[in-house]
């Protein structure tokens, strides 16, 4: 699973960051997804996460009783039908479009639009929109095509908006599932741009590339400046701390 993220912080002139994660996904005894982070590169200081609480929204259980762990009632589970209103429009090629609206205003329900097979009801695409824990989110999902994979997302994209104390934060996330195994499972939260380039399923756009270039150029300038003015022992302590701190 790869999760590239970009953050736009309105306060302070529009600061932008980008992070990418490459995770190994497994299921625990209860069938809950468990992620082991193999790679992690980021322009956020100390490789911290922004809006980390919304990352769980990237592994929705569309057909489950709740979409995200214990939060948000799925409109596609039979037990939750009483909480939603549905409108169906027939489409060509044996497809139908379903519009879903909450019967009552509540943070545990959402609006949704899905493309389904008219005969089987299998969902091929679905969009969700809602608000939970002070975060407004918009999620677009492409489901897997065949067999057991059709019950889970193949690709999930999300935009999340959060406002707090005058700061407006926007996070844009894309997760791709079912990537071929290329790297060793022994990796643990490694910051390696070369390895990330090998597994990245979606090429970086120009804006994302520019963010990385500015970050590494600035870090090089700081490192060069410190090398010229302070002992190397202090350089290792002060400059590399943000890289290794997460692994201590």
Protein language model features and the residues they cover:
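Gly/Pro-enriched, hydrophobic low-complexity segments
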Residues: 85-88, 93-192
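Structured extracytoplasmic
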Residues: 1-97, 103-109, 173-248
